[in-house]
């Protein structure tokens, strides 16, 4: 039987001469060339069915429908009597995707972009998409100044209609800016203007921001910087007329020319506010006041608009429109600001939801909210909730979204999206140190116990000079009003002589409890009561120690040189503790802005064996240098003072110390300040006042009753760390300074003869500088620092590299 076949080659040509005006009836549909695609799937994508009478338009629609599936490179439709024959060539399946030569763009990012374009393993390969991808990647390289870059897609056929896809990159080098020319500037020099750019034709060694490598985005940012510079100085008619970027023939150098018109300076003649002000006209006008003769300032105009939006947002107007239309008078060189305000609808909050708190209970987050459900929306209250969640320290990140309720004109839902971090730490370690010998440490700390927000911890230390155990518990919401309750129990056996301190042994234990009372958003007060028992023994006579014992009426027998007293002194003390805290940091760990400050006082109450008070102050402030918070300046101040009451002195075992990773880095722990002046008594001596001082042993630290420590840090982005881990690592350069002194110290002929310094001086500041790295590891915060002492005194001990677990600042 002769077969009559006709090919429909183009959708634009008619086949009426073949099929006739009435077309033909499809009795069967037959496919040729199908491999991966099932016949049923192909039939479903066609608009033609067996029994249909079809014509030219139907054939065209069939071809278009099959191409639209993305499975075929070629489609042909033929007729054999009443049978419709569909010949197809399937697109090959992608078996693998690899990259070569890409250094500036990571594989993961490339895969994400390819998948967004439909190019992924297991899918059909669209060769036309590859051309677009090649061009898009090359355009990206051009935008970052790599004009010699090329991207080539290499397709390697495999059996069973499969292919390997490989993108081969030739990145080349970044074109460097040879010169930046500014044409049209009169009031300011080109050097002054270019100094504000990120792109530079010359970069001084100290400039860590400037860059000679051309990037299109950075140029756009620099042009905006230039525009803002002039608009903020009254040049209301300033305009950038054109920008030319030209390449050198070898595509390695770039010349940038910026043509601009400065215009003249304009002053503000007045401000008019009109529109729907929602009854807050007086407050809004207070935000738009100007000084007589004030220059036009673009940034101030923007700030006015933002302030008006924030004001209306506090009253529930979540989506106000504020548009400023400058009315420029070229005759007298003035500008009048016409501010149009549309407050819009007033919204109230239907629901507050939390997303991502898999461990923390909703109630723990909800009690931090200042925005209430059912109340008018206050944007400032919503932001306060975000800040309070960040300060908890339970979350790596906190984001908030305000969404309109569909179909309701005046309701919104507020959703806080949190990413929880590990708030519990368990550590066990065995180490060896030159001072501590073999050391065992173990501890468990959970700042968000079972998601309740309560903090529970137990820790212990065992080494050559200390055995310490502590159990602590804090409930930050002991009452619904936010009154906190904390308590601790501890035991400590401390052999100071083995810790490079003055010779004595102290066995102490105690219990304490504290109530905290919130005053407002950022301030709180604390009051508590502690009981502490101290049992002192093995005391080697030295001036500060025996001065204290004499003040409390203890006069042990004089011992000879090198021996320790057999005296056993016990003290039972009750302390009243009070304190004030201020905190407006933007987050609980690794803050970037805000201040944390605290002042504390404790005093021994009647019935105690000791009579003294102790005051401490600690403050840290963070000042971001960039909007991203990656560059931050931090300043910290710590100070303390203690003194006796009723003629008694402060116990030497409760002195202040400095030096080490938590105070003045670069110095050994607790070694800054007064040293022990040991008595050197001969046989038969009856009073220490007649004994000379041992001038050969002035190294053991004894601390003092006054302390001051200052720190300044520049927090910088951590190099070689991806954005994924940047939030858990912090690098900083620092300068530390501090001292400890004894206000009750008096040099005697014996101490002078032994060469003992005057420990009453507060001016003997030690200074160090260095670099620190903090890492919020799965084991808890790890702190590494390397510091070099810049200013030190006799008897100080250096320690350049220091490492600490569980401490951040």
Swiss-Prot record:
Superkingdom field: Bacteria
Gene of this entry: bamA
Protein name: Outer membrane protein assembly factor BamA
Any one Gene Ontology cellular component term annotated for this protein: Bam protein complex
InterPro entries: Bac_surfAg_D15, BamA/TamA_POTRA, D15-like, OM_assembly_BamA, POTRA
General function of this protein: Part of the outer membrane protein assembly complex, which is involved in assembly and insertion of beta-barrel proteins into the outer membrane. Constitutes, with BamD, the core component of the assembly machinery.
Chain ranges of the POTRA domain: 24-91, 92-172, 175-263, 266-344, 347-421
Matching Pfam families: Omp85 (PF01103), POTRA (PF07244)
Similarity comment: Belongs to the BamA family.
Quaternary structure (record): Part of the Bam complex, which is composed of the outer membrane protein BamA, and four lipoproteins BamB, BamC, BamD and BamE.
GO BP annotation list: Gram-negative-bacterium-type cell outer membrane assembly; protein insertion into membrane
Location(s) in or outside the cell: Cell outer membrane
Keyword presence, Transmembrane: yes
Signal peptide coordinates: 1-20
Keywords linked to the UniProt accession: Cell outer membrane, Membrane, Repeat, Signal, Transmembrane, Transmembrane beta strand
Xref: NCBIfam families: OM_YaeT, PRK11067.1
Membrane listed as a keyword: yes
HAMAP family per UniProt: OM_assembly_BamA
């Amino acid at each position: 039987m002769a077969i009559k076949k006709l090919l429909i080659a183009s959708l634009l040509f008619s086949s009426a001469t073949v099929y006739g005006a009435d077309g033909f009836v499809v009795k069967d549909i037959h496919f040729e060339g199908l491999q991966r695609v099932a016949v049923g799937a192909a039939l479903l994508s066609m608009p033609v069915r067996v029994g249909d009478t079809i014509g030219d338009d139907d054939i065209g629609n069939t071809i278009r429908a099959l191409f639209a599936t993305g499975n075929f490179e070629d489609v042909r439709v033929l007729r054999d009597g009443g049978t419709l024959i569909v010949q197809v060539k399937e697109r090959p399946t992608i078996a693998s995707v690899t990259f070569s030569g890409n250094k500036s763009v990571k594989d993961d990012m490339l895969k994400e972009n390819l998948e967004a374009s439909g190019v992924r393993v297991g899918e059909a390969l669209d060769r036309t998409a590859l051309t677009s991808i090649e061009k898009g990647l090359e355009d990206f390289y051009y935008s970052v100044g790599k004009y010699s870059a090329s991207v080539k897609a290499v397709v390697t056929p495999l059996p069973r209609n499969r292919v390997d896809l490989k993108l081969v990159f030739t990145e080349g080098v970044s074109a460097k800016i040879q010169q930046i020319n500014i044409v049209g500037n009169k009031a300011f020099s080109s050097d002054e203007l270019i100094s504000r750019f990120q792109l530079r034709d010359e970069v001084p060694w100290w400039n860590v921001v400037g860059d000679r490598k051309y990037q299109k985005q950075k140029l756009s940012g620099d042009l905006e910087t230039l525009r803002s510079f002039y608009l903020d100085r009254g040049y209301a008619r300033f305009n950038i007329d054109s920008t030319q970027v030209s390449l050198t023939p070898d595509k390695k150098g770039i010349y940038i020319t910026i043509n601009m018109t400065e215009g003249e300076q304009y002053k503000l003649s007045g401000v008019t506010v009109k529109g729907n002000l929602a009854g807050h006209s007086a407050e809004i006008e207070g935000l738009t006041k100007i000084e007589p003769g004030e220059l036009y300032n673009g940034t101030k105009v923007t700030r006015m608009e933002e302030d008006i939006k924030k004001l209306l947002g506090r009253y529930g107007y979540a989506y106000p429109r504020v548009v400023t239309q400058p009315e420029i008078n070229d005759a007298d060189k003035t500008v009048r600001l016409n501010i149009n305000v549309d407050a819009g609808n007033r919204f109230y909050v239907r629901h507050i939801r939390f997303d991502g708190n898999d461990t923390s209970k909703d109630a723990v987050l909800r009690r931090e909210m200042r925005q209430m459900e059912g109340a008018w929306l206050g944007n400032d209250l919503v932001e306060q909730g975000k800040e309070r969640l960040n300060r908890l320290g339970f979350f790596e990140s906190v984001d908030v979204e305000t969404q309109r309720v569909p179909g309701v004109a005046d309701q919104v839902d507020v959703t806080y999206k949190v990413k929880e971090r590990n708030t519990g730490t368990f550590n066990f370690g065995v180490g060896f140190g030159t001072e501590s010998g073999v050391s065992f440490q173990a501890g468990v700390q959970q700042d968000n116990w079972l998601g309740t927000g309560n903090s529970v911890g137990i820790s212990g230390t065992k080494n050559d000079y200390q055995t310490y155990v502590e159990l602590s518990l804090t409930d930050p919401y002991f009452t619904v009003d936010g009154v906190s309750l904390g308590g601790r129990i501890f035991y400590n056996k401390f052999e100071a002589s083995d810790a490079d301190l003055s010779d004595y042994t102290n066995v102490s234990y105690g219990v304490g409890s504290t109530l905290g009372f919130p005053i407002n958003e950022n301030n709180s007060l604390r009051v508590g009561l502690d009981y502490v028992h101290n049992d002192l023994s093995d005391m080697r006579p030295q001036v500060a120690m025996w001065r204290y014992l004499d003040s409390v009426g203890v006069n042990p027998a004089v011992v000879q040189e090198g021996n320790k007293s057999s005296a056993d002194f016990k003290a039972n003390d009750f302390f009243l503790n009070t304190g004030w805290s201020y905190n407006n940091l933007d987050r609980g760990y690794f803050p970037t802005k805000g201040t944390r400050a605290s002042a504390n006082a404790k005093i021994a109450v009647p019935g105690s064996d000791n009579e003294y008070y102790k005051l401490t102050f600690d403050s840290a402030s963070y000042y971001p240098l960039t909007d991203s918070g990656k560059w931050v300046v931090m300043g910290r101040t710590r100070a303390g003072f203690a003194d006796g009451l009723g003629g008694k002195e402060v116990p030497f075992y409760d002195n202040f110390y400095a030096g080490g990773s938590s105070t003045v880095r670069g110095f050994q722990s607790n070694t800054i300040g007064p040293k022990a002046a040991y008595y050197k008594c001969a046989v038969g001596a009856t009073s220490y006042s007649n004994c000379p001082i041992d001038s050969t042993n002035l190294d053991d630290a004894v601390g003092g009753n006054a302390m001051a420590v200052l720190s300044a840090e520049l927090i910088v982005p951590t190099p070689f760390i991806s954005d994924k881990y940047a939030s858990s690592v912090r690098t900083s350069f620092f300068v530390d300074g501090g001292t400890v002194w004894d206000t009750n110290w008096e040099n005697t002929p014996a101490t002078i003869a032994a060469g003992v310094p005057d420990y009453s001086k507060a001016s003997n500041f030690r200074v160090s500088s260095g670099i620190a790295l903090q890492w919020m590891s799965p084991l808890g915060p790890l702190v590494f620092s390397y510091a070099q002492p810049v200013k030190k005194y006799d008897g100080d001990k250096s320690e350049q590299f220091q490492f600490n677990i569980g401490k951040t600042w």
